Amino acid sequence: MKTRIHVVQGDITKLAVDVIVNVTNPSLMGGGGVDGAIHRAAGPALLDACLKVRQQQGDCPTGHAVITLAGDLPAKAVVHTVGPVWRGGEQNEDQLLQDAYLNSLRLVAANSYTSVAFPAISTGVYGYPRAAAAEIAVKTVSEFITRHALPEQVYFVCYDEENAHLYERLLTQQGDE
């Protein structure tokens, strides 16, 4: 797994990967944080694609994921997932966060994409504690790629150095980095 999982500090919208994962709200209509940055970088085609998905299936439930084209992003596609809002840890948040990663990975693999970039799901305005979220992310992704050929490369994209070090430390502890 050492060569399959990477930590990158920077702007997820600039990565040349097959799929960028967008953390969105159930409406898929764009918002603040990473969601807003991805929508701005992708241009109006992404919002149009999200509107079509929403018209077909309605809101995207927490822990679920959908895939669309990537608009003006360097990626080929965007997987939109709804992470859980942190409510103290007693509202099934851990399982919902794991589901957000798993369902995103399943869409990447099902569409034969080889690389994916994840932001730190739910750690922004949704308030999930960073360390707990990183542990779930690393464990879930590591277990998935152990059992599946795709994606070949997974990137955890961290906005700041502190979060990047957190992911690097967890991967080192697992022997993955």
From Swiss-Prot:
Taxonomy, superkingdom: Bacteria
SMART domains, per database record: A1pp
Catalytic activity, reaction form: 3''-O-acetyl-ADP-D-ribose + H2O = ADP-D-ribose + acetate + H(+); 2''-O-acetyl-ADP-D-ribose + H2O = ADP-D-ribose + acetate + H(+)
GO biological process, one term: purine nucleoside metabolic process
Pfam name, any one: Macro
Keyword entries, A-Z: Hydrolase
Enzyme class: hydrolase
Gene3D superfamilies cross-referenced by the UniProt entry: Leucine Aminopeptidase, subunit E, domain 1
Binding site for substrate: D11, I12, N25, G33, V34, D35, S122, T123, G124, V125, Y126
Annotated ranges, domain Macro: 1-175
InterPro entries the UniProt entry points to: Macro_dom, Macro_dom-like, O-Ac-ADP-ribose_deAcase
Keyword check for Hydrolase: yes
Active site: D35
A molecular function GO annotation: ribonuclease inhibitor activity
EC number, as in UniProt: 3.1.1.106
Reported function: Deacetylates O-acetyl-ADP ribose to yield ADP-ribose and free acetate. Down-regulates ribonuclease 3 (RNase III) activity. Acts by interacting directly with the region of the ribonuclease that is required for dimerization/activation.
Subunit text: Homodimer. Interacts with RNase III.
Family note: Belongs to the MacroD-type family. YmdB subfamily.
This protein's name: O-acetyl-ADP-ribose deacetylase
Species this chain originates from: Shigella dysenteriae serotype 1 (strain Sd197)
Gene: ymdB
